[in-house]
Amino acid sequence: MFKYRNKGRKGRNTSMENMYELIAPCHFGLESVLKREILDLGYEIVTVEDGRITFRGDVTAIARANIFIRTAERILLKMGSFRATDFDELFEGTKAIPWEEFLPRDAKFWVTKATTNKSALFSASAIQSIVKKAIVDRMKQTYRVERFEEDGDEYPIRV
C-alpha cells in the first residue's frame, strides 16, 4: 500500500514565473474538504467559491493534485481571465491569450463547456463557437498558416 507523506514546500525550487493558477471544481458542500486536501499538499489557496477552489502551483502541482486530491472532479489550468460584455470583447480577449504556449501546433481542441455568471452573454453554444474561432485565429497567426490542422492530441477547453 502506498502512503503519501506531505513534506511541505520546503526545499522546492519554484519561481513565480513558473507558477500557475489551478482550478479544482467539486460538488457543492465539499469545498472545505477540498481546501484541506490542497493545503495538505502545500499549495496556496487563491479563492474558495461555491463548487470550486482556485490555488497556485507549479507544473508538478498539476500532477500531484490529480493523483492525491480525491474530492475534486478534475484539475483545470487557468489560461487567462478578462471581462467581456459582448461577443467582440469575448473574441478579442480570447485571442489575446497566448494559446501557443499551451497547445501544440497540431492540437485538436474543442470548447466542452461554457458557463456564465450574471452575463449578457448567455448562449453557451455561441460562446463556445466564438472562443473556438478566436483560438484558431490566434494559432493560425502564430504559426503563419492558412488552415489550422487539428490532427494531434486532444485538448478540451472550458470557459
PLM features: residue spans?
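Non-catalytic, regulatory and substrate/membrane-recognition segments associated with hydrolase enzymes
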Residues: R158
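Basic Arg/Gly/Lys-rich low-complexity intrinsically disordered segments
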Residues: M1-E17
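Non-catalytic nucleic-acid substrate-recognition regions in nucleic-acid-modifying enzymes
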Residues: E17-Y155
